[in-house]
Amino acid sequence: MSQFSELISFIRKEINYSLKKLPIPDTPNYLYEPIKYALKGGGKRLRPILTHLVGRAYNTDPNSLMNISLAIELLHNFTLIHDDIMDSDTIRHSQKTVHHKWDTSTAILAGDGIYTIAQLVLNSIDRYDKEINKCFNEVT
């Protein structure tokens, strides 16, 4: 395996670990169970990996960089939940989509909850700047 491949693998593992460690409450279960379900679905994590690589190139603080990468991945999951509803998809990453496992209203609420978590992750950046939030919201 090349050094670059090893780096990508390492970053992916760190992102997956950090996603699992997000402080997502257990109650109310009807809200947080679908959120946790959506986030454990996996995927390539391409967006946060690219974000991480660019941040490393600019010597971004590692903690801030991880939070930015997590926020990007959370934003992506938010859009996937809503996209699955719009496209009537029933499977995402080899598991039932959130709206198919629960219902459309729960899926919309879970997607919105993930977006809120992404905002909280961004706000936890030590050198948080309103420009970060502005850029993030323009992407959405």
Predicted regions and their residues:
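N-terminal amphipathic/basic leader segments beginning at the initiator methionine
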Residues: 1-23
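Mg2+-dependent prenyl diphosphate-binding active-site environment of isoprenoid biosynthetic enzymes
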Residues: 20, 24-140
